Amino acid sequence: IKDLSEIQYPVNKIQTIEDEEVTTQLALDIQNEFKDQYEVFRTCPRELEVLPKGYSKGATLVRMMDMFGWDKDKVFTFGDGENDVSMFGVVTHSFAMGQAMDYVKEKAAHVTKSNVEQGIVAALKDFNIL
């Protein structure tokens, strides 16, 4: 796709993979131009997600918790990218993975080991769930 006008159907998500500098500039450009229409998340230094305003993992988690009656103290969230941070404020037990960007680690209640070090398993063992 060379121009967004070529798309003739609703767009639920746009994801880009590009050099870190290009991704940084693209995120700023989209936020400046379309901040009232879209959510922009860095999933890692080279990847960007663009979603309709109000769409996020956190918003979806809130809907699921309401629907199923889940208690925020009994739900655990894990993430390593900006797109995961919205979940962290929804629950008591939020974990940034060891490989997460510093910004993500700052927002989580806990930091666990990386994916390759079985970070989710380690965190669940720390809480005597496994």
Where are these regions (language model features)?
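Hydrophobic/aromatic beta-strand patches that form the interior of the parallel beta-sheet core
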Residues: 76-78, 95, 110-112
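A general structural signal for well-ordered secondary-structure junctions
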Residues: 36-40, 94, 130
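Asp-based, Mg2+/Mn2+-dependent phosphohydrolase catalytic module
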Residues: 90, 98-130
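Conserved acidic, metal-coordinating active-site core of Asp-based
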Residues: 1-78, 82, 87
